[in-house]
Structures are given as C-alpha cells and as structure tokens.
Amino acid sequence: KNMDKETFLIQDPKAIESFLRGNNFPPDMKAEDVIEQVKNDEMTPQGLVDQIADDNADLFNVDIRSLEIYRSDDNGESFYRTHQEDLQNVVFSYGYYFGQVKVDPQDVDTVYATGVPFIKSTDGGKTWHSAWDSSVHADIQAIWIDPNHSNHIIVGNDGGVDESFDGGKSWQKLDHQPVGQFYTIAVDMEKPYNIYGGLQDNGTLKGSSSNLWHDNQYKGKDWERIFGGDGMHVNVDDEDKLTYVGFQFGNSFRLSSAAPKKITPPTYVGEDLLRKNWNTPVMMSTHNKDILYFAGHKVYRSMNKGDDWTAISDDLTESENRGNVPFATATSLSESPLKFGLIWVGTDDGLVWVTDDGGNDWNKVSKRLPQKQTKGKWVSRIVASPHTEQRAWLALNNYRNDDIQPYLYKTENLGKNWQDMSHNLPNETINVVKEDPKNDQVVYLGTDKGIYISIDQGESWDMLGNQLPTVPVHDLIVHPRENELVLGTH
C-alpha cells in the first residue's frame, strides 16, 4: 500500500500481473503497461491500491467508534453514558442496522443491546457481557423479554428465531419455522424446476419447487447453498448451465462447473470509482443470454457473459454520495422483453431513466412524475411490461421520511405521462410489481404485508389468497412453463 516508485519498479512483472488479475482490473491493463506508466510518473503504486477500493469502501475502511449506551433518569431531560469501557465489536460500522436497547420489565438495571452479537448488563449499563453463544446466528435485530418471566427471552436475527429460558446463558433455535430473508428470486426450466434466491446473510440458495422433496424420487433436492455472503440478484442461463449470483455491494460472480469467476465491472485508474447499491441490480438479457447488464451509478453492458464490460450511460443519479453508506446508486433495472435495448433504470435518490436505443440516449422521465409525491423517493421497482412496448410500472419507497404510503405509477408512453395506480391499496410500502406474463390484465404487487392482485390493469386491487402470513414480499416471479406464482419473502 505504501510502496514507493523505486520499490515498485523492481517487483517481478509476473507478481504485478497476478495482482492486476486478482483485483479485477480491466483485462487490457497489462503489467508491462502499468510498469511503464509508473516509470513515466503517469501512475503511482498508491493509485493502483486506491483503485481496488470503490466508493463503498467508506462503509468498511473507517475508524470505528465503539457502541455507546446512554441512559436518562429524568424522562429524557438529560442523558449520561453508562459505561467507561469501550463496547467494541458489537455494531462495527453499521449500528443503524440493529439499534435495539431493551430493558427488563421487572428490573430497570438489566439491559440488553443488539448488534452482530448480543450483549447484556445487570448493573444499569456499567458493565456488559455476551448474552449469546455460537448456536445463535449473528446480527440480532429484535428482542422480546417475557414480562412475567424475565429470563425467558426470544431474539430475531438473520438466521431466524432463538429462545432462552435462563437470561441468555443457553439458547435453542426455533427452527420449526422455515424463515429466511429473501431479496430476490429466480427459476430455471428443469423438471421439476428449481427456485433460486439471494438471502440476507445466508448466501444464495437453490431448491426444488416440488412438494415431494422428501420422497425418494427427489431425495437430496432440498435447499442447498450455492454461494455465500449476503445473497443478492440471481440470473439463470439454462442453455449454458450458468448461474449468475452476487453478494452485497455489487460483487458479482458467474458459477459453472469450474471455479466461480468474479465478473464485477472494473474501472480504470483515474476513472470515477463505481458506486454500487447494497442490492446492486444485475440482469441477464431476455433477448440474448450472453448479454448482461449491471447498474451502479452508471449502467454497464457485457456481450460475453460478464468477461468484458462497457459503460452505456453516464452517471444516472444526482451524484450526491451522502454519508458512509453508499448512496446515489441504481436500485432497479429492467429490459423490455419486446424490444432489445429498451432499458429502464431507477435510483435511490428518486430518478427514473429510459433508453430505447441500447444506452446511446437516456431520457430522465422522473421529471414527468408528480414531484410533490415522488421527488427523492427510493425506487423500489421499475419494470417493463411484457405485453406493451411503451408501458412500464414504477413503485417507490419513502421509508426515509417515516412514510409507508403505497407509491405506484404506470406509463403507457415511455414515461412521457404517468398515472397513479395506488387506488384502493392500503398503507403498505410496495417492494415489487409485475404483470402476469400471459394475461395482460393481471398485475401482481408485493408489499411489506403481503401480495395483491389486480385483474383490470391496476384499476383496483385485492389481496391474493388468505394463507400467506403477514410478511414482506420482496420479489415475485411467474414460472413461464408451469404458470406458478413464486414469492420471495423477507
């Protein structure tokens, strides 16, 4: 990292080449060229190191302040820090993801705090100790303390639900509920077909759609983990037996019978670093399965399964990268199945763009939306219609302003005009919207509380079925052959 020019120039060119390839530098950036550029002061060793990182590195490569617990004994008039020692390795750099402090209802000095682990104090927060063991999944996000029996505790985490009857000394997993936090889902064309999903902190899973999992015919076809990390977008190429997966912040890979190959678009030294959302949109073209799209703050296209990438847009965000959590990034990406090169993009800062010529020209159509209702809101989904070329559906999310209203719009003319389609929907944030692939009138909608259906192109909505628990539906897909609706719940 701190290597000077002279030291760099005496390194083995093979080692430099290995460094370049192992860190996803562009394939045409060769060791001999880099050596020559450093020699001529056109590049520095530090510049190479800086290029390995991206704008997302600010989330992790920071000096972390430890967790701090404050207490008020006068109804919030004043607060004081309860502990002198630093509470390290609890929330790391993303305490906002947890943020739970719970007090025992029978003892004001017994307190629990959630983080990657789970900690407890019995002296009013002066000292803290671990209240979990290795059987409990990391990332504790919810806690319930039995008001009648304080030692009875239930916690929710990225792996499900765990229960303790002795105040956190020992735990048992409540694994009779098949729970997981799906971000996205995909299907293949095998018989029976498989379902794929990217899950929070549980990688990418693959499992048979058959309800005969445990019969001899399909023995061993239960869910299997095919990739790690926080699983995100999944694309399946049935023809070439390839699966495209990824984990947080746009780390994308191609899976085959060989070793996984990282295919995240690289950036050249001197270019703006690529900003990527936690759940970076990656999409395989419906027109040609060799073609992939990847959306950070720009859209990239690969014509050869992710081996090489070309930017097909400029920055499609407002470019205001606020804080240490990546911002000003694409959140949704959709290609029309009716026309190659007709692509829609939505961003976390409320912009919607469309191109109908493969990225040569982009039109910012969010300016045509009612600005008072939509400006600056997170685009949870923009999706092209499979029936009408110029139609698209748009859903937005306004969590940032403590607002759970459903924001749903439709355009019939490539974004020139938008129609509010929320109509009779309840106050539930919308995560996904898709038209049925066979019936033009049928539209499905996944919200934070379930699944809705319209049979009149969104003029009215009804809850679909009555057996789905009250759970957030983050993705949905209708299998093209079986005509079965598959939901991914979070």
Residue ranges and their predicted role:
Residues 1-490:
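Beta-propeller blade termini and top-face loops
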